[in-house]
Amino acid sequence: MIVSWSLKDAVVVVVGSGKNAYRRVNLCLSENSSKIFWFCRSSADGGFDVGHLQLDAKKSDAIEILPISEFDPVRSLTTLGKEETDFLVDAVFVSESNHHEKEILHRTCKRYRIPLNIIDNPSLCSFTLPATWSEPPLQISLSTSSNGCRLAQRLLRHVVSSLPSGMPEAIERFGRVRAITKTPEKKQWINHVSDFWPLEKLVRMTEDDLLAIVSDNFSLPLSSSQSSSLANSYESLSTTLDKPSLTLDPEAFPTHKRGSIALIGSGPGSPDLLTVAARKAIMKADYVLADKLVPEAVLQLIPRHTPLFIARKFPGNADKAQDELHQVAFDALSRGDYVVRLKQGDPYIYGRGGEEYLFFTQHGYVPTVIPGISSALMAPISAGIPVTHRGVADQFLVCTGTGQKGSMPKIPSFVPTQTTVFLMALHRLEILVQALIESGWPRVLPVCIAERVSCPDQRFIFSTLEDVVEEYNKYESLPPGLLITGYSCNTLRNTA
């Protein structure tokens, strides 16, 4: 278990010499410990072997350097502390793994409940130090639970190297905006940006960009494609306004002087599950308009020079966000841009794709529609659930867990041989489950919660209808997710 522990104003004992001892002393100094008793070995010149501390912190009044020969594993720990702690010290660090009195130290610290860390002796420690990287305000700690500190350091370097440049400064900007954002609703908007928007985009956002997110009337300031007017000219896919354009030729994604737009399904999350047509369209786009739930791995396929606008569809702001998105699209279309409207899953399965198709068509722009793999289809496959199976399920139904304007949708009748998938349901899971039970659905019906399907951190929680809420509440949510119900949930699990 990793916890954040403060050593501010603490009295700490450090035993040992060399760089490991120095690091622990420096750690205590950075934590503003009030007093550090450093029991140190002598150096070759007769002084103390304090390493780099000679150059900086040696003069600090917080440090008292003592010969290691004066250290007593009982007396030193029970007399050097503050009066308010009955003279017990607050923590002990031992930087020598073969210290001859480490067993006595362990028993003493255990008796007096003094936190103890002995390097390379996890069985004698009451706490261990994780591998830590810090560039304020960002701190990252990683632990292998005492199974390999060198491996932990290597893994930490890998994690840190994957961070976009400028992440600490971006966190500071987020902190300032959160501090001046007063309403809970707008703070939730900021949380959604933190949860769903690509990190590469977050580090490029200014404080004004963040303030625009919580503004009621201000569109996000985004750079437009300066070179779109010089883009190659393509033949129009369709000039007919009375029928959808559903051409899947990967080379046929045109722009003309009036601009053109494509509604594209980005699939459940993995870039590998994008259609070839969708990939080609993304690469050729002059402007991309994306839903907030489109995973970062998919958004990373967008060329860096292509402007990206992410819809501000936060709770309570969906309609305004849709209007804003339309305006951004029209601005790009009026420049002659080829606009890609990137939607999670499939545009026509609870993606408002039909509404957007009608809207743009009525305004003179007939969208190309490129389907995507819906999570309603992908989630059961990833979870090992055959939505139809001879003798178990011969029907498949896709429903929403959230009706228009947040209302409860009509609950379908229970059919024993039917697999039902509820999209947009997990944020109101308890209400939905109660409605299903009240409508006669069996309490013991097998169910599965699927989250972030096809992403590296995908998760599946199997349960029954009556227990799924309690089971789900044991975990932090990983949106987007959905609920799968039906006896097919256990078909393959029972044979495993």
Curated annotation (Swiss-Prot):
Pfam families: NAD_binding_7, TP_methylase. Belongs to the precorrin methyltransferase family. Keywords: Amino-acid biosynthesis, Methionine biosynthesis, Methyltransferase, Porphyrin biosynthesis, S-adenosyl-L-methionine, Transferase. GO terms for molecular function: uroporphyrin-III C-methyltransferase activity. One of its GO terms (biological process) is sulfate assimilation. InterPro entries: 4pyrrol_Mease, 4pyrrol_Methylase_sf, 4pyrrole_Mease_sub1, 4pyrrole_Mease_sub2, CobA/CysG_C, Met1_fungi, Siro_Cobalamin_biosynth, Uropor_MeTrfase_CS. NCBIfam families: cobA_cysG_Cterm. This is Probable uroporphyrinogen-III C-methyltransferase. Its EC number is 2.1.1.107. It catalyses: uroporphyrinogen III + 2 S-adenosyl-L-methionine = precorrin-2 + 2 S-adenosyl-L-homocysteine + H(+). Siroheme synthase involved in methionine biosynthesis.
